[in-house]
Amino acid sequence: MDNELLSVRELEPSEHPMVSAWARAHGCGKFDPRLLPANRFFAVCVDGNPVMVAALHFLVGVGVAMLDHSFSVPGLSLRNARRASAALVDVASDIAAQNNCGVLQMFVPSGIARVAKTLGFQEQDNNLHFMTKQCL
């Protein structure tokens, strides 16, 4: 993948089982597509095959976009993950700006935070945890 051209496209609903398998492989438990934001879910691809995915959604009225539900294909090297992350962040930043969002945020584990800093993100609080609660 080092010298191959990356492309970014919207993820198809038929690909949700693949994302679920990636989430389990990374120890993230069950991936529930019902928790996806309604805006956009992207895949970074090499030769048309997804290697990383993430969801982008907009917080209404505050000019903030959130990038989350990010997973990579199991076994993706750190070098290739950085490359795919950069492509994903570039596209997400452009779409956020087109939708009048001046800030792109994400909640990530420590390892990804280190990569995110190289992509222009700034750490706001090193004690945040991503939490969900079932209500129905």
Regions found by a protein language model. Give the residues of each.
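A conserved beta-strand-loop-helix scaffold within acyl/acetyltransferase catalytic domains
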Residues: 18-47, 51-72
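Residue-level preference for short coil/turn positions at secondary-structure junctions
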Residues: 4, 37-38, 100
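Acyl-donor binding region in acyl/amide transferases
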Residues: 65-120
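Generic alpha-helical hydrophobic packing signal
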Residues: 2-6, 44-47, 86-90, 105
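Short, structured secondary-structure boundary patches
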Residues: 50, 54-56, 81-83, 90, ...
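Short amphipathic alpha-helix that is part of the acyltransferase structural core
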Residues: 1-32, 127
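Terminal substrate-recognition subdomain of acyl/acetyltransferases
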Residues: 1, 46-49, 60, 97-98, ...
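Glycine-rich loops and low-complexity Gly/Arg-rich segments
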Residues: 32-35, 79-81, 90-94, 129-133
